[in-house]
A protein has these predicted regions:
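Short loop segments at secondary-structure junctions
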Residues: 12, 41-44, 52, 116-121, ...
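Acidic, metal-coordinating catalytic segment for phosphate/diphosphate chemistry
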Residues: 1-36, 42
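A short coil-to-beta-strand element that immediately follows conserved catalytic motifs
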Residues: 91-100
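Conserved Nudix-box catalytic region and its N-terminal flanking loop in Nudix hydrolases
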Residues: 23-35, 41, 45-82, 86
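A residue-level structural signature of the nucleotidyltransferase/glycosyltransferase Rossmann-like core
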Residues: 6, 45-46, 134
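A broad structural signal for alpha-helix termini and local helix breaks/kinks
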Residues: 88-92, 117
């Protein structure tokens, strides 16, 4: 597998023109961009994935539908499209779709996209190096996983907030965006 190369951002989320190789120590005041895609079923459940056993971070834990680091030259939406396709084999058109939530964290910026799709799990093509399995889960099931420490420990309350976004903006997510399967 080729080394991942990331753009380096400043504290104000501007690309610095520099890049860094993943796993390379790169100092303070340098940030990178990661993305997550939350696929919700029309009935309100979220598609979640179990991270592969071989993953360095959070192996064997459940997490949101897809996510990862933006590669050098990618905008947020491009990284989101690529990650969901690589990990799940699901094509989405997120061009001109703003992230529904952006979180600043110690090492960078994390953009969350929420889409509503009735996805047939049997049609997904899982990236074995990243994803062990997928399933639909209710908010209560994910909350239980968080209590049992079987779900990636995102910021406190973040997962519940994603459901609030889904519940309060589902018209915009469903019809007002171009986040459709292609």
């Amino acid at each position: 597998m080729a080394d991942e190369i990331w753009d380096v951002y400043d504290v104000n989320r501007r690309r610095t023109g520099k890049t860094v190789i993943r796993e390379q120590s790169w100092g303070f005041e340098k940030y990178h961009l990661i993305v997550h895609v939350c696929v919700f079923h029309p009935d309100g459940r979220m598609l979640i994935q179990k991270r592969a056993h071989e993953k360095k971070a959070w192996a064997d834990l459940w997490e949101v539908s897809a996510g990862g680091s933006a590669l050098a030259g990618e905008d947020s939406w491009q990284a989101a499209e690529r990650e969901v396709f690589e990990e799940l084999g699901l094509k989405l058109d997120l061009k001109d779709v703003r992230p529904h939530l952006s979180v600043n964290y110690e090492r960078g910026f994390d953009d969350f996209y929420c889409v509503i799709r009735d996805v047939d799990l049997n049609q997904l093509v899982l990236q074995k190096e990243e994803v062990a399995e997928v399933r639909w889960a209710t908010q209560q099931e994910v909350q239980q996983m968080e209590r049992e420490h079987t779900f990636v420990p995102y910021f406190s309350g973040l997962i519940d907030f994603l459901w609030q976004i889904r519940d309060n903006y589902d018209g915009a997510i469903c019809q007002g965006s171009r986040a459709t399967e292609v």
